[in-house]
Amino acid sequence: MKTVLMVAEKPSLAQSIAKILSRGNMSSHKGLNGACSVHKYTGTFAGQPVHFKMTSVCGHVMTLDFLGKYNKWDKVDPAELFSQAPTEKKEANPKLNMVKFLQVEGRGCDYVVLWLDCDKEGENICFEVLDAVLPVMNNAHNGEKTVFRARFSSITDTDICNAMTRLSEPDHNEALSVDARQELDLRIGCAFTRFQTKYFQGKYGDLDSSLISFGPCQTPTLGFCVERHDKIQSFKPETYWVLQAKVHTDKEESLLLDWDRVRVFDWEIAQMFLNMTKLEKEAWVEATSRKEKAKQRPLALNTVEMLRVASSALGMGPQHAMQIAERLYTQGYISYPRTETTHYPENFDLKGSLRQQANHPYWADSVKQLLAEGINRPRKGHDAGDHPPITPMKSATEAELGGDAWRLYEYITRHFIATVSHDCKYLQSTISFRIGPEHFTCMGKTVISPGFTEIMPWQSVPLEESLPTCQKGDTFTVGEVKMLEKQTSPPDYLTEAELITLMEKHGIGTDASIPVHINNICQRNYVTVESGRRLKPTNLGIVLVHGYYKIDAELVLPTIRSAVEKQLNLIAQGKADYHQVLGHTLDIFKRKFHYFVDSIAGMDELMEVSFSPLAATGKPLSRCGKCHRFMKYIQAKPSRLHCSHCDETYTLPQNGTIKLYKELRCPLDDFELVLWSSGSRGKSYPLCPYCYNHPPFRDMKKGMGCNECTHPTCQHSLSMLGIGQCVECENGVLVLDPTSGPKWKVACNTCNVVAHCFENAHRVRVSADTCNTCEAALLDVDFNKAKSPLPGNETQHTGCIFCDPVFQELVELKHAASCHPMHRGGPGRRQGRGRGRGRRPPGKPNPRRPKDKMSALAAYFV
């Protein structure tokens, strides 16, 4: 029998689809990468019996990046990134080994059916999958079609089975539009980001951002936030005056009346009107009206509206809301959550979707009433031609989902029910009064039929007292007329919901990328999220936007990105040439980049006002090896050391604490060592600031601390403190942390493995001797006599932490969130692989300390 390979976008989706198509009769096993499962079953395809293999990827298989040497910031002019720097497709997550996994599963298959998400990104992933599997599949006979695309909008039996019977082809134009967007964002973003990051971090010490990034979508998004901030700052409150009248009915009921003039900004004029009315005793009814009005039911739900409500009503950030929606979709609770459409298709089964909710404990009564009376025809919205609106696909309870997932599901379901409910109808009563020469009005609303507000109570018409019955010519007693002094108020900072609306209006980003752009400006420390999910720009965000406006406003205005998005959509529709759009857009931004570089002094003037130069920032910490003066430690991101005398800046490890290391000095350059620590339970290691930035040996790279330094005699180096190969990763070496006592630690110098050992020992030292079994360095341990774990109250022991049974009970391995005793091999580990420094995969360097240290040192300088 022939074999059909089917590929979904996520492992959970693959399992759900396979379960539906196989009717639960399938076998499953983990793939070679450990992340994706393979589900097998037999069935029919193209009228013949076949073997089906259903598996998945984990999002994008490949990512776009520059060739190796162009990723070195210090050696490449950012201007070269626009055209001269070649790009290549790399595996998005090398640890998953996705290409090899797809090739193994695709080898010998005859057909491939692509079940990737039905959007532009999904089409792009289709071709990434095809690039991996087509070369290893069986050759087609007589031009037989072998590549198929399944299109679906929800994970339901009906939708999946229908998709399987209506297979089509992947859309190459949509995939190309994604390639174009990726390349534009990479080249433009990297060029501007590298230039401004290097320029400003080399001059200012309190920017508090490790990366001063620029993005064609990210920067206009920030621009909206700063524009609102500028309006708030430039706002000047004005005083105005309002007349307020209170009248009484015969039954002593009081009514507050609104002045028809609303307000006046001249006190004398307001006082004149007050004088003309305050002595009047009666208010005359000049007109009454009663009108029936309707509040429209909502349009069908699309992504942007869902994100707006999630932020404003549920308090969820757009990124978080989108992640929850995707999880609900993959679990089959809602339809595909990325859509711009607000109009149900003509063949959409509204009654069927509604019946699924008929027994729900929260809204069963409303649904049953709707089904009995007949559903209302939904409003005609916008049909973007992508996916149906977001709807619930099955009933779920709060106990079943819980937390934010339930809150979002509840809103989606209530919104769906509301779209097929009736409009809310209410009666609006208005009475017009005259007090002296001035006119006042009183309004009231009475609900006739709640309609959709019964299922969406937060949308209900505000309750107001009903107005008394009266007619033209009636009089009411004037209780008082007073003048109120008020002031105009500035607008508030943008909420996430308002920002999403602005981005949609100006065409910045897509329904899928809008949450990413908002999340980026938060992570870059350009804005902070205040109460009410309002976005307040930071000093850095404000200065950047003002600088862009000063140099080239189009870098921050939404117009140019909106035009680019339209061109990308034309590529997706097959109406524009990929290479022409790419070349034209890059040429425009290349010119803008050169002008930006030439005019950077304009932004620098703004930076000078808001931020402190490096020399005036930070606190003295360690001595420079060149001038022997104190260097200043700048704690703000990115943390670094700056010598104002030599005008040199040295980068440091991030996301930890830095302190002076016992005033010890590096034997190579005389710089004082500093100690980096990620916390009491994490890693820590000393480093030389100069060696960290300028590696002294050929086998070292920039960013290596003393725990990776191969100096043969330095007491802090890998050569003196290295023990043996890491138990988890291929290239790492476990190194003793000499600063960790009395709670001693051994940590890998590459991955996050930390072994806690020998608590309360007086002294731990790496011996020159090695283990006969695994060739790891032995440890000499001197225990506290009162707390010695050794038999016979002995205090000293020398052994191997991998092989010595005494030490094995005293060593606990930690990495990520797991911990376990450190044994060689063991369940779940790569059994059979040596843990010592003598057993290594072929081609791996041997990190043993050199026996002939002087020969080794000489070898470095030859």
Curated annotation (Swiss-Prot):
Catalytic residues (positions): 336 (o-(5'-phospho-dna)-tyrosine intermediate)
Cited InterPro entries: Topo_IA, Topo_IA_2, Topo_IA_AS, Topo_IA_cen, Topo_IA_cen_sub1, Topo_IA_cen_sub2, Topo_IA_cen_sub3, Topo_IA_core_domain
EC main group: isomerase
Alphabetical GO biological process terms: chromosome segregation; DNA topological change
Limits of the Topo IA-type catalytic domain: 171-593
PROSITE patterns: TOPO_IA_1 (PS00396), TOPO_IA_2 (PS52039), TOPRIM (PS50880)
Family listed: Belongs to the type IA topoisomerase family.
Annotated protein name in UniProt: DNA topoisomerase 3-beta-1
Species this chain originates from: Mus musculus
Name of the encoding gene: Top3b
